[in-house]
């Protein structure tokens, strides 16, 4: 409709939550935090860690930078968006902005030179 190319990429999928998927927070029992490991590096209930999500987000951004696109719109999910915003703002997956309100349909805008991320 707008004359733009639409592409899908599995690296933009939501964080995999393993055995916790399909359950509400009230249905889940709290899991003990492993000693000596940052919570963002834990694969809770067999799912993905935030480190895993950050790895695929870095890969995606590297690929986008290599394409030298003038503008890109990314559509993704909550935790993945939070990780992407953290990367674009120069933060680690261990230091994400959990106070940032990301509701369904949120639009976040960043003007970034992807070639300068590293």
Indicate residue ranges for each PLM-predicted region.
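Generic structural signal for well-ordered alpha-helical scaffold segments
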Residues: 54, 58-66
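Short glycine/proline- and acidic residue-enriched helix-loop micro-motifs
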Residues: 33-52
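Domain-level recognition of soluble alpha/beta enzyme cores
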Residues: 7, 91-117
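Phosphate-coordination/substrate-recognition cap region in phosphate-metabolizing enzymes
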Residues: 1-33
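Active-site catalytic microenvironments for nucleophilic, acid-base chemistry
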Residues: 1, 63, 67, 87-91
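Generic beta-sheet signal
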Residues: 68-78
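Phosphate- and divalent-cation-binding pockets in alpha/beta enzyme and binding domains
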Residues: 83-84
